[in-house]
């Protein structure tokens, strides 16, 4: 499995400019400074993580069917990107194979580890044309590794994405978000503790601003490559107590990255639309 820490390029949809112009300008500035950021054309929204194919090997991507239930309304149906596999093939050329499947998966619901993938079990509900056992077997085949399922907290959100809950660190360790329902996180950890080494939790100070409290989950939605980590920031200068607390924890959890390569990016524009940096990329 290709994990975040061995990737070398970050892609964003050109739609980021239209939907989140401030965040787009931040990314353009980083690109102009030489950071490994690229933009692609042809998508209908900015949430590239959910519709673009998932890299499972150095020269292989899997293009799942993008048909989320939360976009099945007249208002949002036209925002569904159905040609993501073709976009990826244009970007990759003959460098990699893109495999199509009829399994419905949002890419934000796939957290890759060295030898497995973690998903919210909403994926079963999303694929009524598969039995649970057949779906599980096919996902295992496509990813080339074990697949672990954590429960869907449908009271917290309609998306059911694992990248808002947990991320893989390294050496079998996981990092969990500051989640509104601590019982839910404990339930997820109980399931995953048999397959991973250590469980770490992001924490937030009780003295933070009430207006920022609902966005504290977002720090888990960071972007990671082999050289850089980009953390969502809630304040423009990344100087609010939540941002500084999160940054210190990232520096602790990722000692292999120079501190100057762990970079906060003001992302409130995207967070207000219910997605973070990982969701956009």
Set out the residue ranges of the language-model regions.
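The feature marks the mature, well-folded catalytic cores of soluble enzymes
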Residues: 1-281
């Amino acid at each position: 499995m290709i994990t975040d820490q061995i990737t070398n390029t970050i892609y964003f949809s050109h739609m980021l400019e239209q939907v989140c112009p401030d965040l787009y300008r931040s990314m353009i500035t980083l690109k102009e400074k030489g950071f490994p950021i690229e933009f692609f054309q042809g998508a209908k929204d900015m949430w590239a993580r959910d519709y673009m194919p998932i890299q499972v090997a150095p020269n292989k991507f899997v293009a799942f069917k993008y048909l989320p239930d939360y976009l099945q309304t007249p208002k949002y149906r036209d925002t569904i990107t159905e040609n993501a596999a073709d976009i990826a093939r244009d970007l990759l050329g003959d460098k990699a194979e893109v495999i199509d499947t009829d399994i419905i998966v949002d890419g934000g619901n796939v957290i890759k580890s060295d030898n497995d993938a973690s998903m919210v079990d909403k994926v079963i509900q999303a694929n009524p044309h598969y039995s649970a056992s057949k779906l599980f077997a096919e996902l295992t085949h496509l990813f080339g590794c074990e697949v672990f399922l954590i429960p869907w907290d449908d009271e917290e959100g309609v998306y059911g994405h694992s990248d808002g809950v947990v991320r893989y660190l390294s050496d079998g360790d996981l990092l969990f978000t500051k989640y509104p329902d601590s019982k839910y996180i404990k339930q997820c950890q109980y399931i995953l503790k048999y397959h991973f080494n250590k469980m770490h939790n992001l924490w937030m100070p009780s003295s933070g601003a009430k207006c920022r409290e609902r966005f504290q989950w977002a720090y888990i939605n960071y972007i990671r490559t082999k050289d850089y980590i980009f953390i969502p920031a809630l304040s423009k200068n990344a100087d609010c107590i939540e941002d500084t607390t999160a940054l210190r924890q990232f520096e602790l959890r990722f000692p292999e990255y120079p501190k100057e390569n762990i970079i906060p990016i003001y992302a409130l524009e995207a967070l207000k639309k219910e997605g973070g940096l990982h969701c956009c990329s």
